[in-house]
């Protein structure tokens, strides 16, 4: 039997630190449920002490997700550890993840502490946390720039104090595969009680080496890999879960290890995370990019048609890309549609959500002759991540051209009242956004706007993503339609609804249509 590598997913914690990404509690629970289906071993649900929202999200995930270990991050302080335990104690498999910097530059300039103080603090806080929680992980922040002799002392001390996992982060993405592999071997050879703990690794992608470094660490004896879906994370991101897992699976002959990941759930998981975060997956991204299994070269196409193994080292089906054997259109019935949803992996949708998605499908089928899986995927995701509609876009009309100022008139429904406004703008989309702002009485900043085609051909849908900001908080949302202006208006309204939902979710009656 080959060695098992534990997959520690940090999409909900480190992944959420991606610039311009902000997840609400429902987003996090939805992603956590999908990670459960993916069969990750560990879910780092958040940093409970960071905010009330993070605390509530970790608590909700701890109480609702079974199977994976649920982790809460904490600084090396009793206050942080107490907060993390309060959020985690409802989990069947809780773990507190304590971090404390150990590099000279961090100790001197950030912590203002001497090495002996850091050593004592690390051991004391692990010992304290172990008195609360059955599983403790410790991370010496900036480990790869820490003096090895000091790092060995810290690791030995925290393991003796009760740490079950010691995580070795390449915090600034500075190391290389050869260096990192040697670094892990040095730990195994010089920390006398290292066999009493699992060695974990956490690599950042600043030099584009996060996955390579993680794999080098596995070859050198690491047993747990911290990673994120689509490689999300601060700066250039974290090691991509899908790439690590499929490298281990595809090159089992080289790594001589395995994971328990259900690889057929990878594509769906990537798609859900992309939708929720608003972070598009680049087309040539390994494993989950739109072109990952595309062959344009005639020579490559000929080879694949004759024998897939000529140019494909893994099958699309192995990561959840399934061929569509049912053609859906405006004459398709609910039964065939539901069967197709099941084929796509959506087997646990409620009757209400299924009915709403089918309704949207029939509306789309009246506009499009050919319905693709991408179209259906967009409809499903928009319904899954739907928040209560305080504001509804009932009607819009634009007047535009290259010699006139674009004007948009919108009608918004709020609490049964109809609000109509018109506005001018720099193009029909800008005019529509301004009209919606006037009608809803909001004042937000548009941070991002981008669009992509869903499907192909002249009747392809447009999927618009917008990010708005209010009082330092960012809200992202999507809209889909065969009409770009309509898709844009829907996305903007959805973002506004998300803003109001998160602001007034405990008392939606506060919303008025003044």
From Swiss-Prot:
GO terms for biological process: L-leucine biosynthetic process. One of its GO terms (molecular function) is 2-isopropylmalate synthase activity. SUPFAM superfamilies: 2-isopropylmalate synthase LeuA, allosteric (dimerisation) domain, Aldolase. Mn(2+) binds at residues 14, 202, 204, 238. It catalyses: 3-methyl-2-oxobutanoate + acetyl-CoA + H2O = (2S)-2-isopropylmalate + CoA + H(+). It is found in: Cytoplasm. Its main location: cytoplasm. Keywords: Amino-acid biosynthesis, Branched-chain amino acid biosynthesis, Cytoplasm, Leucine biosynthesis, Manganese, Metal-binding, Transferase. Belongs to the alpha-IPM synthase/homocitrate synthase family. LeuA type 1 subfamily. Catalyzes the condensation of the acetyl group of acetyl-CoA with 3-methyl-2-oxobutanoate (2-ketoisovalerate) to form 3-carboxy-3-hydroxy-4-methylpentanoate (2-isopropylmalate). This is 2-isopropylmalate synthase. It comes from Clostridium kluyveri (strain ATCC 8527 / DSM 555 / NBRC 12016 / NCIMB 10680 / K1). The gene is leuA.
């Amino acid at each position: 039997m080959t060695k098992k590598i534990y997959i520690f997913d940090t999409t909900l914690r480190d992944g959420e630190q991606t610039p311009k990404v902000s997840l609400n509690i429902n987003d996090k629970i939805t992603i956590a449920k999908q990670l459960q289906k993916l069969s990750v071993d560990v879910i780092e649900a958040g940093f409970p002490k960071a905010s009330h929202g993070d605390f509530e999200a970790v608590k909700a995930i701890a109480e609702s997700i079974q199977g994976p270990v649920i982790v809460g991050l904490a600084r090396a302080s009793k206050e942080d550890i107490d907060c993390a335990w309060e959020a985690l104690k409802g989990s069947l498999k809780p773990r507190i993840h304590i971090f404390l910097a150990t590099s000279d530059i961090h100790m001197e300039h950030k912590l203002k502490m001497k090495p002996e103080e850091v050593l004592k603090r690390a051991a004391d806080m692990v010992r304290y946390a172990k008195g609360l929680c059955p599983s403790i992980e410790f991370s010496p922040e900036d480990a790869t720039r820490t003096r090895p002799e000091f790092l060995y002392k810290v690791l030995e001390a925290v393991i003796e104090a009760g740490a079950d996992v010691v995580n070795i982060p390449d915090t600034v993405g500075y190391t290389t595969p050869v260096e990192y592999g040697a670094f892990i071997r040095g730990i195994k050879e010089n920390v006398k009680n290292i066999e009493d703990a699992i060695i974990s690794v956490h690599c950042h992608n600043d030099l584009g080496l996060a996955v390579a470094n993680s794999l080098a660490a596995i070859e050198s004896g690491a047993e747990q890999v911290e990673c994120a879906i689509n490689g999300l994370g601060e700066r250039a991101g974290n090691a991509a879960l899908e790439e690590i897992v499929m490298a281990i699976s595809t090159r089992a002959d080289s790594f001589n290890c395995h994971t328990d990941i259900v690889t057929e759930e990878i594509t769906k998981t990537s798609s859900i995370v992309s939708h929720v975060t608003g972070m598009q997956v680049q087309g040539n991204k390994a494993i989950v990019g739109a072109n990952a299994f595309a062959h344009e070269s005639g020579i490559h196409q000929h080879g694949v048609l004759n024998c897939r193994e000529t140019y494909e080292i893994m099958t699309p089906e192995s990561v959840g890309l399934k061929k569509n054997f049912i053609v859906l259109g405006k004459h398709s019935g609910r039964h065939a549609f539901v069967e197709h949803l099941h084929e796509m992996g959506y087997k646990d949708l409620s009757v209400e959500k299924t009915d709403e998605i089918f309704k949207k499908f029939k509306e789309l089928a009246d506009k499009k002759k050919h319905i693709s899986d991408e179209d259906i995927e967009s409809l499903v995701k928009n319904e899954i991540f739907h928040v209560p509609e305080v504001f509804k876009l009932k009607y819009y009309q634009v007047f535009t051209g290259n010699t006139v100022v674009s004007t948009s008139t919108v009608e918004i429904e709020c609490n049964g009242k109809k609000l109509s406004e018109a506005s001018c703008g720099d193009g029909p989309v800008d005019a529509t956004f301004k009209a919606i702002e006037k009608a809803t009485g909001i004042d937000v900043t548009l941070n991002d706007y981008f669009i992509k085609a869903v499907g192909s051909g002249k009747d392809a849908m447009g999927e618009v993503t917008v990010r708005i900001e209010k009082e330092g908080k960012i809200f992202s949302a999507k809209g889909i339609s065969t009409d770009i202006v309509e898709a844009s208006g829907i996305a903007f309204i959805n973002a506004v609804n998300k803003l109001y939902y998160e602001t007034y979710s405990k008392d939606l009656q506060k919303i008025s249509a003044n």
